[in-house]
Regions:
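Positively charged n-region of N-terminal signal peptides that target proteins for export
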Residues: 1-4
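Short amphipathic alpha-helical "recognition" segments used for binding
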Residues: 6-7, 117
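Bacterial N-terminal signal peptides
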Residues: 7-15
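A residue-level marker of the well-folded mature domains of exported/periplasmic proteins
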Residues: 19-341
Length: 341
């Protein structure tokens, strides 16, 4: 598998170098991304900027610590009248006003990974199959527990992402809807009773919020050695919150099947240590490469390659999109993940 992966990476780099050699005129692209303290977002920003420069674009890279700061960054970016703007939204519901200004100036806007809501100013969207993320987590649980063979009952809890991230409900719904038949049959049991997105969401994706909630659940429903068999955590940070919560209460049940996402440094370390079962790898090189090719197309006045023209809607319009396929990573293939610490 590793040889195949490396071969694909080499082929991908050749494609990108070919794009760079085609010689775009020097045009400025504004890149706006969340949280500079996040290892993955810091890496994504640096990678996208590098690939844009290799494709002969000038780049201005911005990270924000909150939604208000990103709004101001976007307003400033629009004033500079760039060739294109790429946005990984801090808050997908907060960018409507400055995006209206971008549309008035005919500036192409591409949403990176997080769909920006309530605006008709988004030109294109590039992400991964986010419903598939949750479904892949659920399929992993199904296989490990032998649910197809009627095994159970097993206890399960959910830790979802932030309500202001449009991907978070997709992750949760993908997992929950796949596992719901097993919940209905009694093969999976949710002792806390928390089975809807709002009940299991984690404000700001903050691990401390998830840890507090899971500590309460463990103390109330899993005391005296009762086992928590499965936790579907939306990403690696939230998975680590469960690990810390179990350590803080002295959890004595059987090991928990624990999902994650992002293949971050903490997730990979926890998989190697046997504390986390799996993660979902959304390879930043694949998505950043797609973004570069989208920018190149719109700047040159052509149509970017897209693979979904019907399913991605932000409450105002259907957004032409390209959706990549994520990869399940566990202890058997953990070495395919690039180190972006």
């Amino acid at each position: 598998m590793r040889k195949i992966f490396l071969s694909l990476c080499l082929a991908f780099c050749v494609v990108l170098s070919g794009c760079a050699d085609e010689g775009n005129s020097k045009s400025t692209v504004q890149l706006l991304f969340p949280n500079p303290d996040s290892g993955i977002w810091k890496y994504i920003g640096q990678l996208c900027a590098q690939l844009m420069r290799e494709a002969n674009y000038e780049v201005e890279l911005h990270h924000c610590t909150n939604a208000a700061e990103q709004v101001e960054q976007l307003k400033a970016a629009v004033e500079k009248n760039p060739a294109a703007i790429v946005i990984g939204a801090q808050d997908a519901n907060a960018l409507g006003e400055p995006l209206t200004l971008a549309k008035e100036k005919n500036i192409p806007v591409i949403a990176y990974d997080r769909l920006i809501m309530h605006t008709d100013a988004i030109s294109y969207y590039a992400s991964f199959e986010n419903n598939s993320v949750g479904e892949f987590q659920a399929r992993y649980v199904e296989e490990k527990l032998g649910l197809k063979n009627g095994a159970g009952p097993f206890t399960i809890e959910f830790i979802a992402g932030s309500p202001d991230d449009t991907n978070a409900p997709l992750f949760f719904n993908g997992a929950f809807n796949y596992l719901k038949p097993y919940i209905d049959k009694g093969q999976l049991v949710v002792p806390s009773g928390q089975k809807d997105f709002q009940s299991v969401a984690t404000d700001g994706w903050k691990p401390d919020n998830a840890q507090r909630r899971m500590t309460e659940i463990l103390q109330k429903y899993y005391a005296d050695g009762k086992s928590l068999n499965v936790v579907v955590a939306a990403n690696d940070d939230l998975a680590e919150a469960l690990i810390r919560a179990q350590e803080s209460v002295g959890y004595k049940g059987t090991p928990t099947i624990l999902t994650g996402q992002d293949a971050g440094a903490n997730g990979i370390a926890n998989i190697k240590a046997g504390k986390q079962s799996m993660t979902i790898y959304k390879d930043p090189e694949i998505l950043c490469g797609k973004i570069v090719r989208m920018v190149k197309a719109v700047v040159e006045g052509s149509q970017p390659a897209i693979n979904d023209v019907t399913n991605i809607r932000n409450d105002v319009k259907t957004i032409p999109s390209y959706l990549c396929i994520p990869i399940i990573v566990d202890s058997t293939n953990v070495d395919i993940v690039k180190d972006f610490r």
